[in-house]
Amino acid sequence: VLSPADKTNVKAAWGKVGGHAGEYGAEALERMFLSFPTTKTYFPHFDLSHGSAQVKGHGKKVADALTLAVDHVDDMPQALSALSDLHAHKLRVDPVNFKLLSHCLLVTLAAHLPAEFTPAVHASLDKFLASVGTVLTSKYR
């Protein structure tokens, strides 16, 4: 459960991401594909090379979903309901992949926002991303 301090930290950190959200989302996906090659199996139709338009496009979708989650942090299940349905019923993404992408996103944010990425912010973002993952996998049951 996110504390009020966690919510404040997440909103402040995501605010610093600003117009780079899509870029950071794509970078996190690239990190995931390189570090965890089995995740590529969900994207057989994508050009997964560095800087590809498809990876950039999906990175923007990831970032937009996270922005939606930040904006609706008190009601993520409702805000992410359609996305949860998509991943559970149509795409059938293995839930472990949300943890892998979350890790890669944390690394990406730490690399780009070193001053903001304090231990407290790191912990808050980690809890937030775990909450997003829980919401996205809630309809698997």
Curated annotation (Swiss-Prot):
GO cellular component terms, A-Z: blood microparticle; haptoglobin-hemoglobin complex; hemoglobin complex
Phosphothreonine, modified sites: 8, 108, 134, 137
PROSITE patterns in alphabetical order: GLOBIN
Residue positions where Phosphoserine is found in the record: 3, 35, 49, 102, 124, 131, 138
Residues annotated to bind O2: 58
Quaternary context: Heterotetramer of two alpha chains and two beta chains.
Official protein name in the record: Hemoglobin subunit alpha-1/2/3
Species assigned in the record: Macaca nemestrina
